Amino acid sequence: MSAFTTKTAVYVLARAFPGTELLVWLGTVMALYGVVYAVLENDCRRLLAYHIVSQVGYMVAGVGIGTEMAVNGATSHAFAHILYKGLLFMGAGAVIHATGRRKLTELGGLYRTMPLTVALYMVGAFAISAFPFFSGFVTKSMVVAAAQQDHRALVVLALTMASSGTFLHTGLKLPYYMFFGTDRGLQAREPPRNMLVAMGLAAVLCIAIGVFPQPLYALLPYPVDFEPYTGMHVTESLGVLMFTALGFVMFLKALTPENTISIDTDWFYRKGARYFMWLAEKPVARYEQAVSNVSATVALPLLHETARAGLWVDLTGVDAAVNGVARAILRGGGALRRLQTGIVTHSALAMIAGVIAAIAIFAVVWQ
């Protein structure tokens, strides 16, 4: 998924920000950044993940250059990267599935028991390294050629160095120490058939795109004016790859992986978490304890006394008034009840008396 989902950002950049100068330099830094951290990595999955950063850097730089060739290169490289990076992760996953280990310092000697996995992995390694007749050669080189055509010598140099570093670590260091190198005596075997079939399909596509790039070129957003298989281009690419291989042989001991954990930007939140824990355990905890003490010694007794006073006011004041009114009404009702005898003559007499009283009142008022 990581090989696929990272391309959504490239798509957004290509649609919204082609030709943005800042992206050229961000992409160039990304291409080198991933390679530099891959040098330090011992975990095969993290090593491949760092090269995702590097390869996406090519795409971002291509979008930033913004010419038709550069955008075509970024788009085609995004498509090719999904295939060969998926193949590389499947190869590493097959090794982890077979051995339960993922550190290069714990692997080695697997070529005897996992030859198909080695062969399929190397197809992906050649593709990401831009070997001729593999998919990366016909896509990645388009971005570099666009930078050269746009007279960006520094960008061309940086992207070429990143390509060399990719071959050094993904195409040489990782397979050497994972499949060859010191035999660790691991009892491994080829992964299940469905895993091999998936790797095989990805490998076939990596080779097919490298040999027949025109169907992919036909899908690109602009007409393609780029020929990857020129004598000069093939010679330059093979020269970079050969010198990289020579450097690997010469500095093999220096490139031996060490059983360490590489710290990347996670250094910041590791340090931040340490200070956060100190803050939570010391000042914040002390503040919470002080608030609890004040609450227990001052606030809670005050609240209890206030509640008692409120209860007294309710019982002696509010309830007394309400109950007093109710008693008065009850007594008044009892007194009035005695006036009602139920005899018709008494009722008639009361009505006559009431009428006489009303007439007398009106007479007095209207005088």
PLM features: residue spans?
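Alpha-helical transmembrane segments and their membrane-interface junctions
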Residues: 126-142, 203-224, 294-298
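Hydrophobic transmembrane alpha-helices and their helix-loop junctions in integral membrane proteins
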Residues: 1-194, 211
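Hydrophobic alpha-helical membrane-embedded segments
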Residues: 85, 243-260
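Membrane-entry segments of alpha-helical transmembrane domains in multi-pass membrane proteins
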Residues: 18-22, 76-79, 154-160, 234-236, ...
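Aromatic-capped, Gly/Pro-kinked transmembrane alpha-helices
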Residues: 218-233, 255-367
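Hard-cation-handling environments
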Residues: 191-245
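Alpha-helical membrane-inserting segments
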Residues: 13, 17, 61, 209, ...
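Hydrophobic core segments of alpha-helical transmembrane domains in multi-pass membrane transport
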Residues: 31-34, 125-129, 160-164, 202-209, ...
